[in-house]
């Protein structure tokens, strides 16, 4: 690291001379240390798949779950600082419920993602706080059909056919860039997602029992049981 | 970079000895990394045209849209930090709707642009925040006729016959400075805009399907379909 | 620049050992980069004249207007940071209208200028903000007769027979110091002002179509049309 | 320690270039100096066991108690800065009682732990405060059955079959990782916990009279008397 | 300047090791650059006299007036930063009027001076602001008789028989220290004051038309006309 | 002191790399300069004893009193910064009275001590303040029986059979660690306390007339008169 | 001054490694530059005596008065920064009157002194302010009898038989330590006080007309006239 850089990267609210926000870039490093996950659309729905790092047999498995339901038609998977992620997921749930209480219907998924991303953007512009060290994939169904977004520490959001976050993001993306086709069946999509994750995750044990959840048109989000997951592992 | 400069460019609220605000200049660097877009007036209306960077085939195209409608007679295109841009566009929409609710009619376009620019100026004068890393072109129709403004990170606004922002701004401007004529037809203006963008954008792929939107006297803003766009590409 | 100076000029709220406020002096440098303008009193009124920098033929001329009406008996011309100037002009207009709503009559011009100058002074005394990088000439008519003030980044105001701001301030002042006489006719005053501006402005193009506005006893402020301006240019 | 590190670890709200929050890591060092404690689930309940450092015979033993009841179905044991721990335990009790007053029933244990952890997370993201220098084990019974969580200075929470905090955490965890079996009886679990603590605590005196508390299905939390504890010590 | 000093003089709220407040001392330097003025008591009243710096014939003379009426029995003359002085004079006028509205009578002069001085003292004790760069002489009549005070950037006030502020303060004071007698007539006092000012002011032009104002028992404050002033100039 | 330390010990809200809070440790140094005092329980009550430093015969003795009644069943003795101690004792008295007003009965002593300690803990966690430079011994009677606590600058509290604070704390504690027996009579306890203090206090004069106060079951706190004290001094 | 010290003495809210608050110590230096004053009790009352520095014959003597009445049974004399002293004396007067309005009787003198001292203590503990650079002697009569306190920049208060502040404090105290006897008559006490002051004040002129005020049982505070003072000067 050069001296010039150090002068700009310790104060969140300043630009470097070439227009970069170092603190946001460093927060992305925290995400790059996180577990790998992906979202993938199929013909009539969208699935989330995440590796599951079993650090110790003493940890309850439910405690390792990376996929979180926001409501019964939207789920999210996160990578990065665990506590930051929890706070943002709760923020999403509360925003969603407030909308329901106020307007009688749940939020459009894009608006829900924007609400979370706006919160994250503010932490990159105001002094006295640090950015959130987290990326989030949101997946779900709304009146437009299956939706799949990611949101990064800068508060930037994009919509995808498939998308990955975490340590193995680059390998997963390279795999899907090559293999992904539209109009996959749910089955094909999940098998492709698992193959993509396997190509990226060095630690085999964390792919022994990955997490899977999906939603299909006309249904609610379904988190796969161990039995359902195991069908996809050979 | 000289030591003298470093002393002044890390604290947003101070002037340098020669009266410059370095943080604002650095925010402009963030804009210079953004995608290139332009606005161009024609006889009875105004058009916006933007390159569309397709970074990956896995990204949904709607997610790359740079042109945003504020309401049915005003649209904007942005360049720079994507999350900052979203926040400012939402700010514009909310200001616009509040005016409508309060006074029963939409804001004059110039006032709408000033409202956004005042917000941006404040972030260059108060401590504890950074400037917005974004430039915006606003185009639309009001009682005066077709209007076309830009607004930069300093909060400066100008009205133009044609204007460009983003990485290719200088080349586009040089092209239009030479070629632009008043009283172009809509067709001529769009063809000239595309030619100008092509002269500036190195990556050919991002001009494969540029975004186009325009508004004509007596009509509302129209975002071109792929078919409509493709008519202009040869 | 000496090391001793650097220790004091980066924090707005401190005096240097010799009792100077460097940030205010640096803000004046921003004004010295601005376009040149002047105000000049004549027998029964007062006029404002400004060079008009036409940076590009693509910019709408109305967008370059430096002379702004506050209400129909007061106008202002500014030099320095464009966004700061807009914010202060709006501040003046709102103060003026609030007075009218509250007391049924417009503010005395001197009080209006003081209101703006007090705002500017506060930004030189409180931490967490920078001074406004702008000087303003206010001209108008009130019960005392024609009035002509300037206000600088320190918030200092003075009343003048004629006054100049911007890059050419020193030359314009030297010219008028020598030539100005009281009881000029409006015509004579405007011709003298244009001559003074021409003596100061290096870039001839920006004197091709200067801005002129004036007010006479019993009338309201009049912004000159291109035809009216052109009468004075030979 | 390298110079590069020192630049980032004195300001809580910034990330280091590799995405770490040094202040949170240093707060964990405060925890590593604390007394060793553990939580362990058994067939129909969960137990907490803590060493008891008797620094002086002049201290009242009740004052050394590390195990604290939140209400009659949840208890906690802490390690790290003693005053920080007291403040957080009180925070948990008040949150719990507010829930009871508001909704007529006590909080779900997981929600109670999240409430505390959210408080701890905020102290890692906002300026002007330091993180809490404390880790907490929460144990209890709710409608799901026996629950066992820990919460660290980052605000991260996990659910466990057994878990340890404090100076001897690594040795205790290694011991339990090897020995722990599910469906232990309460008796077996407590004996295993004491053996694990003994393997980790160098100062024998602090294992002379360890603290033990447990809860079984259908009962409330029971803090062991000296007599009950002594049964387990040979 | 020594390094030891620099460590203490850039932060207003700290004492130096020898108990000094450097920022207050530096603010006094700003006063030492101001125009010279004095107050002088005579048998049945008190007068204020100030040099009048005519920087340019283009400035309106009223704009150079240093003597300001607070109400018809109190006047003030200031030296130092012009905008700071205006803000404090307005503060005095508003305090005075508020008292009148609240209690039906104007403030005792000493209380009025204290109100201003308390304001100035606060700016020497709180962070985030700088001291006022101004000294003020207040003169007037109240139930005690003629009163004459000064107030400096520290917020210190004293009552005098005669007193001076500004660049020539030391010479004027030395002159009056030697010459002043009690029970002068108004005429004698004004002549002595002008002589004292002349002994201190290097630039003769600024003594061509000094400002004079005085108040006598049973009368209100009177600002001298040019004719009245000229009687005293030979 | 090493450079590494200096980097962490000037900002209260940060941990050092080894998990220490230097500002709290430095505040304890202020306590180590204070006068020595102790609390000691006996069979049916508790006593406080303090040396009394007579710095000058011109000081009123009442002004030197270190033992303060909170109410008639609780007293406290402090060591460290005198003004900080007064503020905290007043805080304890007000908390105590508020409880009485609100609930009709005085606070449980443990809760009273916690209220004060929580206040002290907050000053170790928030920016912009320093910790209190004081340790306090609280002694009294409540429904549990005689109580004896200390509270240090970290906000840590412990309950004791006997405890000491101030410059001689280590010697007093060593003495009592060796000599203290439970079920002492009040007389024996006070004699032992005085002997312990004498073993620790170098300046004999400050043990000429120590302060003593005690409370017995069924009675209120009694501050010993000079005559009562003198009985114990040979 | 050593480098180690400089690291701690520029930020008010931190302790130095040896538990000192440098800013408070530096504020005491400001007091040591102040005029010398003393308070002295006699048989049935208490007196205040202060040197009177006559810097110039042009200053009104009333303006130099150091002894201030708080109400008719309490007076104070200050040393240090004059503006700080005025603010604190006004604070005392207002606290006193508020008590009277609220409870129908004036404050107990000790409580009045504590109110002022608490204010001073806060300015030693919170960031963004500096301590008051002032020491105050309060003297008066209340139901206990004659009272005499001092209060220093740390907010520490003590009660005395006699006490001194300002530049000559050490010599005055040494003198009185040797000479003071209880049950002096008012006359003896004042003569002793003047002798003590004379022993300490180098500049004879400031002892030409010292200030004296006293209060006796059953009477109100009496400020001595010049004639009364002169009786004590030979």
Curated annotation (Swiss-Prot), chains A, B, C, D, E, F, G:
Q: What is this organism's lineage? A: Archaea, Methanobacteriati, Thermoplasmatota, Thermoplasmata, Thermoplasmatales
Q: Which organism is it from?
A: Picrophilus torridus (strain ATCC 700027 / DSM 9790 / JCM 10055 / NBRC 100828 / KAW 2/3)
Q: How does it assemble?
A: The 20S proteasome core is composed of 14 alpha and 14 beta subunits that assemble into four stacked heptameric rings, resulting in a barrel-shaped structure. The two inner rings, each composed of seven catalytic beta subunits, are sandwiched by two outer rings, each composed of seven alpha subunits. The catalytic chamber with the active sites is on the inside of the barrel. Has a gated structure, the ends of the cylinder being occluded by the N-termini of the alpha-subunits. Is capped at one or both ends by the proteasome regulatory ATPase, PAN.
Classification via HAMAP family: Proteasome_A_A
Which Pfam family is one of those matched by this entry? Proteasome
Q: Which GO terms describe its cellular component?
A: cytoplasm; proteasome core complex, alpha-subunit complex
Q: What subcellular compartments does it reside in? A: Cytoplasm
Give the GO molecular function terms: threonine-type endopeptidase activity
Q: Which InterPro entries match?
A: Ntn_hydrolases_N, Proteasome_alpha, Proteasome_alpha-type, Proteasome_asu_arc, Proteasome_asu_N, Proteasome_sua/b
What processes in GO biological process is this protein linked to? proteasomal protein catabolic process; ubiquitin-dependent protein catabolic process
Activity regulation info: The formation of the proteasomal ATPase PAN-20S proteasome complex, via the docking of the C-termini of PAN into the intersubunit pockets in the alpha-rings, triggers opening of the gate for substrate entry. Interconversion between the open-gate and close-gate conformations leads to a dynamic regulation of the 20S proteasome proteolysis activity.
Relate the protein's function as given in its record: Component of the proteasome core, a large protease complex with broad specificity involved in protein degradation.
Which controlled-vocabulary keywords does the entry list?
Answer: Cytoplasm, Proteasome
Indicate the family of this protein. Answer: Belongs to the peptidase T1A family.
Identification of the protein by name: Proteasome subunit alpha
